[in-house]
């Protein structure tokens, strides 16, 4: 499994190699963008294809050790991880995500395209972010360097992105003053100096008011490379006031003066802007024409200080299409047009054999002068390796909508990039799977369809993304749907989506959500000996409606305040089996035909720890009245949605030999839940668990600061005015250990659906969470031990997401009680 992922990344990097561009930190026309918190956001690799972007900040490390379980930092990358976290041997469930293999795969692709990827610390949620002591600041920086920096021989702590190395760290601090951040920056600098062969960067995102309550102290007392000022959501100094001076005073000049008198005097100053009208409070968005006027003025006035534009955020830009191009493309065009000496694109190519998944301190994964990324998909004439196109339905949480996502694991192209490959002949048994649906949502099931017969010579490959049904979502959505087609399917998928409810602007109220049904029909031509037979697999999944949603929303505004709204949990679940069949005709053409049908079925059952999905296979034989038959399940109880008859597509839901039962499950959700199950007469469910070791906490204890943080800096008296505490050498790590368990999220843990590619599988297994059960090795030392395997074996499904909405600083955490399902390859 790991080798296939390495091959995937290597192929993708090789595809980008011919057109990569070199990064120039001294340029005045760079474009930086935040990614990781967008609603329904696409994978990072999608944005790596955009030549307009130079720096991508991944957000966020949003839980700080002094305030986080186990004294570990915690992370949130929206819908891009599978929800797995590290658990200490004391049973403390940390907030550090461990199942982020999509990001782990995509960062090297960005770096191969000449982009710098920084890990952002902070965000608007939770509002208790703070550092309590100098020692804690040093420990925080040390932990992040060990976990996300170059792989060090002595480091035995967690590596959430595997051996992938970020290009630096960004500080987007929104709360509780600036104590300790200068110490963190100076500690990072000491670590950077230990790896002189590779360049690392530090950036900060203060709000525009001078002094910024959180970051002015760090900017004055520690050296940053980039300062991108949030010129939005603050009326007194926003970029909009450059256009309309009656609104306030655009203070770029004042910030230049501040920088020249600080330790960050050589930093490049960026203008931070919202990437769409909905990415900030009303009235702060600038049109491209307005931006061009601002950029031309200040790039010309401060050619040595002006660095470019920062955008919040990538998904907002992607959705803000102007003349067929995202907002970011227009910003890059403006920068290049205004720059009297724009960067020159290099013609050198990145060698296709360059290893990019495991960059190390001693060598850069990608040469610094690499050509630019191409946004144009190109046809491929080579046959795609034999693989079955897989589409799996995913569990749905209240207030979100899931749609089918046909994905092929052999794709080397990022989502939404169609590729026309040559013919391929995968071979496997048709399988269709479906997972439980939580009321109040709409869900679809997608067949895993293929045929043992050879497909026709002209395969059909969809070139556009699959439409998704989007019900009303209080407070926004944090799930998405993508379609990637890069292997030759043996089936033609026809997707039908029922009416789409309108989205709701309500953020905290309970909302009636109508059910919708999406039906996927897969057909595969086959040519068996004897009579012609067509195998058809049809699946459908439906959900009931509910007037309750279960969300916990943490919000913050530009001034750093936050609020939380909680509504009731859902109380009923309906699960139905899905089945596919392959039919084989026997007998001569002129004689009656006997059809043997092998049916592979997945159904939902309840085990002691929650839901489980069981896959079973059985064979039936029958004699139709003609020489041609279609092997489909019998519709014995067609569903009827809330909209009345005809509101849903008829599909087999209770085949012969099955029975429907209603029961109350006490372990399936936060409160007793009424569950409708469709089960075989004699089959029972099974469960499985997995547990792997993971590391404990980085310590951060210490006394509270004796001086207020975030005050206007005077002289050299800042949070790091004394001699910095030297960072501990990684070669002196103790050999004593403690065992930690990697835990899967359960229905009692915050969870939001994710997206991205789903790896092919012939079975679907729901794994209950492993209880915190780490054991002490007998040592008093706290040395983290990495997991015994990476999260690559788990297909990305979900995580807690933090969506940025109107009026916020950077980020909003939306947590939803739901179930988690993991596809095991």
Curated annotation (Swiss-Prot):
Its EC number is 3.2.1.14. One of its GO terms (cellular component) is plasma membrane. Residues 701-712, 772-792 have a biased composition (Polar residues). GO terms for biological process: chitin catabolic process; polysaccharide catabolic process. The cyclic peptide natural product argifin acts as a specific inhibitor. Residues 1-22 form the signal peptide. It catalyses: Random endo-hydrolysis of N-acetyl-beta-D-glucosaminide (1->4)-beta-linkages in chitin and chitodextrins. Glycans are attached at residues 559, 717. It comes from the Eukaryota. Induction: Shows high levels of constitutive expression and repressed by caspofungin. One of its GO terms (molecular function) is endochitinase activity. Residues 344-554 have a biased composition (Low complexity). Residues 338-568, 680-736, 750-792 are annotated as: Disordered. The active site is at residue 174. Residues 801-825 form a propeptide. Keywords: Carbohydrate metabolism, Cell membrane, Cell wall, Chitin degradation, Chitin-binding, Glycoprotein, Glycosidase, GPI-anchor, Hydrolase, Lipoprotein, Membrane, Polysaccharide degradation, Secreted, Signal. GPI-anchored chitinase involved in the degradation of chitin, a component of the cell walls of fungi and exoskeletal elements of some animals (including worms and arthropods). Required to reshape the cell wall at the sites where cell wall remodeling and/or cell wall maturation actively take place such as sites of conidia formation. Belongs to the glycosyl hydrolase 18 family. Chitinase class III subfamily. This is Endochitinase A1. The gene is chiA1.
């Amino acid at each position: 499994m790991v080798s296939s992922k390495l091959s995937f990344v290597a192929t993708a990097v090789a595809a980008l190699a011919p057109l990569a561009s070199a990064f120039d930190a001294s340029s005045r026309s760079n474009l930086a963008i935040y990614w990781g918190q967008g609603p329904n956001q696409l994978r990072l690799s999608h944005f790596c294809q955009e030549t307009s972007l130079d720096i991508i900040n991944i957000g966020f490390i949003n839980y700080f050790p002094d305030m986080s379980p186990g004294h570990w930092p915690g992370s949130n990358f929206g819908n891009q991880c599978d929800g797995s976290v590290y658990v200490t041997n004391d049973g403390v469930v940390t907030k550090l995500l461990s199942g982020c293999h999509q990001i782990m795969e995509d960062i090297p692709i960005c770096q191969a395209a000449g982009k710098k990827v920084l890990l952002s610390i902070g965000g608007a949620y939770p509002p208790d972010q703070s550092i309590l002591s100098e020692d804690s600041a040093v420990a925080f920086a040390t932990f992040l360097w060990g976990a996300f920096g170059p792989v060090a021989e002595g480091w035995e702590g967690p590596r959430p992105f595997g051996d992938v190395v970020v290009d630096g760290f960004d500080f987007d601090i929104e709360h509780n003053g600036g104590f300790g951040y200068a110490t963190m920056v100076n500690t990072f600098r000491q670590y950077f100096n230990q790896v002189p062969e590779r360049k690392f960067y530090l950036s900060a995102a203060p709000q525009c008011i001078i002094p910024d309550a959180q970051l002015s102290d760090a900017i004055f007392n520690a050296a940053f490379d980039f300062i991108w000022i949030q010129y939005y959501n603050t009326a007194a100094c926003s970029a909009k006031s450059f256009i309309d001076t009656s609104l306030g005073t655009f203070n770029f000049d004042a910030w230049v003066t501040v920088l020249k008198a600080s330790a960050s005097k050589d930093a490049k100053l960026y203008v931070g802007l919202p990437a769409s009208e909905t990415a900030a409070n009303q009235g702060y968005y600038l049109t491209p024409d307005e931006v061009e006027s601002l950029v031309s003025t200040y790039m010309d006035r401060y050619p040595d200080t002006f660095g470019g534009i920062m955008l919040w955020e990538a998904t907002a830009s992607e959705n803000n299409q102007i003349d067929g191009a995202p907002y970011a493309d227009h910003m890059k065009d403006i920068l290049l047009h205004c720059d009297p000496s724009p960067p020159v694109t290099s013609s050198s190519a990145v060698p296709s054999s360059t290893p990019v998944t495991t960059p190390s301190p001693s060598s850069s994964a990608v040469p610094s002068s690499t050509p630019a990324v191409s946004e144009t998909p190109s046809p491929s004439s080579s046959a795609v390796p034999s693989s079955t196109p897989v589409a799996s339905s995913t569990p749905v949480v209240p207030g979100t909508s899931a749609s089918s996502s046909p994905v092929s694991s052999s794709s080397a192209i990022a989502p939404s990039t169609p590729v026309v490959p040559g013919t391929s002949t995968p071979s496997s048994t048709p399988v269709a799977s479906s997972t439980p649906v939580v009321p109040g949502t709409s869900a679809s099931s997608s067949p895993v369809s293929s045929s043992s017969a050879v497909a026709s010579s002209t395969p059909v490959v969809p070139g556009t993304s699959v439409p998704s049904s989007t019900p009303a979502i209080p407070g926004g959505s944090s799930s998405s749907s993508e379609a990637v087609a890069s292997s030759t399917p043996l089936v033609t998928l026809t997707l039908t989506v029922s009416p789409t409810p309108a989205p709701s602007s309500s953020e905290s109220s309970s909302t009636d959500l109508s059910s919708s049904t999406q039906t996927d029909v897969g057909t595969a031509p086959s040519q068996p000996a004897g009579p012609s037979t067509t195998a058809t697999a049809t699946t459908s999944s439906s959900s009931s409606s509910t007037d309750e949603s279960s969300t916990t929303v943490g919000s913050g505004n530009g001034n750093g305040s936050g609020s939380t709204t909680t509504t009731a949990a859902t109380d009923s679940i309906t699960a139905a089996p899905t089945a596919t069949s392959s039919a084989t005709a026997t007998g001569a053409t002129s004689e009656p035909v006997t059809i043997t049908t092998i049916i592979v079925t997945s159904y939902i059952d309840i085990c002691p720890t929650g839901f489980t999905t069981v896959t079973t296979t059985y064979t039936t034989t029958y004699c139709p009245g003609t020489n041609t038959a279609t092997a489909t399940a019998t519709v014995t109880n067609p569903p009827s949605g809330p909209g009345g008859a005809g509101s849903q597509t008829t599909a087999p839901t209770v085949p012969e030999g099955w029975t429907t039962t209603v029961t109350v499950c006490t372990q399936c959700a936060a409160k007793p839940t009424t569950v409708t199950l469709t089960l075989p007469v004699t089959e029972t469910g099974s469960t499985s668990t997995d547990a792997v070791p993971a590391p404990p906490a980085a310590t951060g204890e210490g006394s509270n600061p004796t001086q207020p943080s975030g005050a206007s800096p005077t002289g050299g008296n800042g949070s790091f005015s004394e001699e910095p505490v030297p960072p501990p050498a990684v070669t002196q790590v103790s050999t004593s250990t403690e065992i930690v368990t990697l835990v899967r999220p359960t229905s009692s843990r915050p969870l939001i659906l994710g997206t991205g590619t789903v790896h092919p599988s012939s079975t679907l297994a729901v794994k209950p969470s492993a209880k915190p059960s780490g054991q002490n090795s007998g040592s008093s030392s706290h040395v983290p031990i990495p997991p015994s395997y990476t999260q690559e074996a788990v297909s990305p499904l979900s995580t807690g997401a933090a969506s940025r909405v109107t009026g916020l600083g950077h980020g909003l955490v939306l947590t939803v009680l739901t179930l988690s399902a993991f596809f095991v390859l």
